[in-house]
């Protein structure tokens, strides 16, 4: 199964935030954001930190695509 984070990138644009701003606000590493940019998997802890920082749910930042 593949994970798509297009919703997250759109949300950042809507909030006028850069990826480095997300890292700082959520307390996550730039490596995690890079992984997400490449469609890689990150821990649920990272996703939870992003959701808390952006005041959203996981459905708002990601989508699981069937193989």
Regions found by a protein language model. Name each.
Residues 13, 27, 38, 66:
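Residue-level detection of the helix-turn-helix DNA-binding "recognition helix"
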Residues 55-67:
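Short C-terminal boundary/hinge segments that cap the last helix of small helical domains
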Residues 28-42:
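Recognition helix of helix-turn-helix/homeodomain-like DNA-binding domains
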Residues 12, 23, 51:
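The alpha-helix within a helix-turn-helix
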Residues 1-20:
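A short, Lys/Arg-rich alpha-helix, primarily the initiator
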Residues 39-52:
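Short, basic-rich loop-to-helix N-cap that marks the start of a DNA-contacting helix
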Residues 32, 46, 60:
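Residues in the helix-turn-helix
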């Amino acid at each position: 199964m593949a994970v798509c984070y297009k919703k997250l990138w759109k949300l950042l644009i809507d909030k006028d935030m850069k990826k480095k701003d997300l890292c700082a606000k959520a307390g996550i590493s730039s490596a995690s954001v890079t992984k997400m940019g490449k469609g890689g998997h990150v821990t649920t802890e990272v996703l939870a930190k992003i959701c808390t920082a952006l005041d959203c749910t996981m459905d708002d930042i990601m989508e699981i695509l069937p193989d």
